[in-house]
């Protein structure tokens, strides 16, 4: 969805969005039940994930019984708050191994987020993407306002679990 702004090679080399510190576990992507079920069993990727309902207390008020999150918190090896744990489906050489039909929507639109800001849905930029930076440039704004934003809003209507609570410092694009 963002290929005109971010190349697959750039993202595969960076991998920032695919690893999580303890304080960023709220950012772990959510999977629809049918995808989580497929990925927790032997599958075409040769990697299985451990999933839990998103409503198990690890997320905000917009969670849904119809979403699952990867369980990553048991993968930390130290007590260091800066330690990062990669997504189960991240290959160190190739990047994400999931095909588009299995990739969470959150991942497809990152570093964009749909957020609830005071009861209004907004499209915001995650300010920590090393390739985009903390301020949206004209190309990104044009992409969002030129149709991608509406696609994200439409997806959120049928998948409300992708909506996150707004956090200060996330520039609103739309």
Model segments located where?
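Short loop/turn segments that flank or connect secondary-structure elements
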Residues: 1-174
